[in-house]
Amino acid sequence: MKKVFVGTVICFSIFLLTGWSLAADTIKIGAFLPMTGAVAAYGQDANNGIQGAKEMRPTVLGKKVEYILVDTKSDKIEAANATSRLIEKDKVVAIIGEMISGNTMAGGPIAEKAKIPVVTPTATNPLVTQGKKYIFRVCFIDPVQGDIAAKYAFNTLKARKAALIVDKSQDYCVGLGKFFKDAFIKLGGQIVAETFCVTEDKDFSAQLSTMKPKNPDVLYAPNYYSPVALFTKQARELGLKAPVLSGDGAQADELIQIGGKEVEGVAFTGHFHAKAATTKLAKDFMALWQKKYKAEPNAFHALGADAYFVLLDAITRANSTRGEAIRAALATTKNFEAISGRLSIGEDGNAVKPMVIMVVKNGKFDYLTTVNP
C-alpha cells in the first residue's frame, strides 16, 4: 500500500511539473482580439495571420493546438472580460493579444495574476510590459518608433517645424506623440502646434485651422488608420500640403480605402513589408498567403503569426504548458527568425528587432527602408 502511494505521488508530481494541459488531447492557446469596433481591421488581419501560422504549424509537444478566439469589440472592458473568460472558462495555457495598447493593458493584469503568458502582436506602448513578468510583445516599442520617426522627419524630410494631432483617447497615440515630440525637439526641431482628437472624430477643421497659420514642414499623426485618413484628406482639401508622417497604427488597407488619393505620400514607421522579408519563415508564410489569398501579407497578418510562432517556440523549449515555464522560455528568446525579422525578447518582455519605413504610393504601401536595432 505504501509503495502504491509513493508511486502515485511521484506520478502526480511529474504531471504537475509538465503541465495540466499535457494530459489533454489538445493544447489550448487563446486570443483576445478586436474583431468588431473601431480597430476591427487590426484584429481581423491578425486573426487571419494566426490561422495561417496554425496551418503551417498545427501541433506543439506532439499535440494539436486548439485556438480559441474572443472578440474584444475594440473596448477595454470587453478586453478584460475576454481575458478572464479565456483563463477561467477555456483554460488556455497562453494568450495572444490584444492589438492596441490600452486594451492589452486592460487584460494584462488579469493574465499576470493568473500567471498565464500573454504575447501581444502590436501593442507598442512601453507601459504594456513595464513591471510585468507575464506580458510580452513581438513588436518594437514606441520610444524607438518615435525616435526613428523624428529622425526621418528631421534628416530625410528636412523638416524643422512639426505640427501634431494626437488621439487623446488612446494610450498608444498619446505615448507615441510624446516620444516623437521629445526626439524632434532634441534634434533641434520645433513643435509649432500640438492638437488633439478622439478616435471617433470625423471633422478636423478646428485642429487644421490651428496648424495652417504655423506653416509646418511636417504633420505628425501618431493615430490609428481612420483618423489619420480623415485628417490627411481634410488637410489636403484645406490646402495644407506638408508631408504627413504616422506610426504603425496607420498600416491598414482601410487607410487607403478611407483616404483615397489624398493619402498618397503618407509615410509611417512599421513592422513588416514583403519587400523587406528575409527569413525562411517569412518566405514560407508569404508563399502560403499567395496561395490562399493571391496577395502579399501585411504587417498585422505577419505579427499575428509571429506571436503564434514565438509562443510555440517557447512552449517547445520549455517542454511544458505550465505558465511559469512558458514565461521563462519567452524571456530567453534569442535571435528567433520571425516573419517580421530576427527578434530577441528579454526579461522586460520587449522585442529587439528591425523596423521598416513605408509610404503610400499608387494606392499601395511601398517599402522605403529598414532600420536595424
What kind of feature is each model-predicted range?
Residues 41-48, 56-129, 138, 197-204, ...:
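Beta-alpha junction/loop-to-helix N-cap segments that form part of ligand/metal-binding clefts
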Residues 1-28, 60, 372-373:
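Short, low-complexity disordered leader/linker segments with a strong preference
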Residues 232-305, 316-319, 359-361, 365-372:
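Extracellular/periplasmic periplasmic-binding protein-like sensory domains
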Residues 111, 177-271:
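Extracellular/periplasmic bilobed ligand-binding domains
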Residues 291-301, 312-364:
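Segments of small-molecule ligand-sensing domains
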Residues 30-49, 57, 70-77, 99-102, ...:
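Extracytoplasmic "Venus flytrap"
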Residues 42-57, 78, 118, 145-149, ...:
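Short, solvent-exposed amphipathic alpha-helices that sit
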Residues 135-199, 218:
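An alpha-beta-alpha
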